[in-house]
Structure formats: C-alpha cells, structure tokens
Amino acid sequence: MLEEIVQLFFAETPELLARIQTAIAHGDGRALERAAHSLKGTVMSFGAQMAGATALRLEVIGRSSDLTQAALVGAELEREVAHLGHALAVFKGEPVA
C-alpha cells in the first residue's frame, strides 16, 4: 500500500508543480489555490510538515488573489517537495544523486 502511494507521489507531483507555476505565471489565483491544495494533501500524506505548510501558504495566497509573494513561496515549495522526493527515492531503494 505504501509503495503505491509513493508511486502516486512520483506520478502526480510534477504535474501539480507545473500547474502551480503556470498559475503563478498567469496570475491565476484560483488555479493556484486548487493546485496548492491538491499538493498539500499529497505531501501531508507522508507527514511532510514543512512542505504541507508551504503548500498551505500558497493556497492562502491564491485565495487572496495577491500573488506578489507567490513566486518566492512557489520556489520554496519546490525545494521542500524535492527533499521529500529524495527521501522517498531512498525509501524505494533507488539510486539518488
């Protein structure tokens, strides 16, 4: 079961991050809110508190429609998700760089 959830993380997360970046680039607060909310649920399923909190910040930014901090928080979220991805790759026994 856990392995399936890990596979789902690797399958869905790149698309969610791309949707977040597109929403930020287009100034689409509603799309940012939805994508950040989805990613928050994904990362929190692994107990990734920092990534979850950062996704929540983006969700709130999207809801407010004041996207002035969105790019900065989006970059922070990408770093947090990369850390989680690294940890999950190690868990799966995959070689990591």
Feature map (PLM): residue ranges:
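Hydrophobic, amphipathic alpha-helical faces that serve as interaction scaffolds
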Residues: 54-63
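Long, amphipathic alpha-helical coiled-coil segments characteristic
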Residues: 1-38, 42-45, 64, 68-96
